[in-house]
Amino acid sequence: MRLVFAGTPEPAVVALQKLIDSEHEVVAVLTQPDARRGRGRTLHPSAVAELAQAHGIEVIKPTSLKADTGDGRLVRQRLAELQPDCLPVVAFGQLITRDLLDVAPHGWVNLHFSLLPAWRGAAPVQAAIRAGDQLTGATCFRIDEGLDTGVILSTLEETIQPTDTADDLLTRLAYAGADLLVDTMTGLEAGTISPREQTGEATYAPKITTVDARIDWTVPAEVIDRHIRAHTPGPGAWTMLDDARLKVGPLVTVTDLPDVPTLNPGALHATRDAVYVGTGSTPVALGQIQPPGKKMMNAADWARGVHLDQEASFE
């Protein structure tokens, strides 16, 4: 099939590469405009744009797909000229307007990293870890006017491991989902896919903000563990110590807590080799800490460097 791929960040690159390597023809790519990154705040193309350019594929970078914008009109004109059979989508980052939904015979097919209708929205991987789900997956569905409400074309399941960070899980889903997306394109072309409506209770995973990533030390230890893993690496779980905001890496698994006193939520206890924090249940052992303006470091090394007061407590 002739495909116009829509995607932007690194997880979408895996799917684009799989489509390029498949029997299908990627004739163009839609992606977000260049963004400023790094200390110099210089403009950089998206990960998807870089891959497409390396393969000589046309790249279109609209600021909006709305029909009343210059970019929106350009996209409509170009799609009419390209005549794609389908538009696969992976984390594109822009709203597909109603009048564009029928621009191709097979429509727009989104690869979403959850088992819909669970975790509709922008952050399904983080939501699944935070909620303590043991099973998630990926869904290819046809985009309609709703928020991830379209008919399901294909799915796969993926077990969430007890130590998975959002990055760990997203990486596995990106690779497995890329194969699923290619198979879905092939199935649509062959006419072997039977779309089905979504059933069951819907849950939602809105975009995560920095405020959302703050750690609440009053909740049970297992909830804090999931919270930290769900926000690793970005935006990064964080807490306050005095007036400093510290990022907190995944916790260290400990089987027992020798010589660790009873700790109130947030209270710190440092030994030679470890740093413990009180929670709403049992204390937890910190793995890594990132002080302001510095890189992640071993929590025990950090504690020695700042000479923790016996009354020190995270807020």
From Swiss-Prot:
Keyword Nucleotide-binding: no
Top-level class of the enzyme under EC nomenclature: transferase
Binding site for (6S)-5,6,7,8-tetrahydrofolate: 114-117
Catalysed transformations (reactions): L-methionyl-tRNA(fMet) + (6R)-10-formyltetrahydrofolate = N-formyl-L-methionyl-tRNA(fMet) + (6S)-5,6,7,8-tetrahydrofolate + H(+)
SUPFAM superfamilies xref list: FMT C-terminal domain-like (SSF50486), Formyltransferase (SSF53328)
CDD domains: FMT_core_Met-tRNA-FMT_N, Met_tRNA_FMT_C
Gene Ontology CC: one annotated term: cytosol
Keyword entries, A-Z: Protein biosynthesis, Transferase
Family per similarity comment: Belongs to the Fmt family.
HAMAP family, per the entry: Formyl_trans (MF_00182)
Protein name: Methionyl-tRNA formyltransferase
Gene: fmt
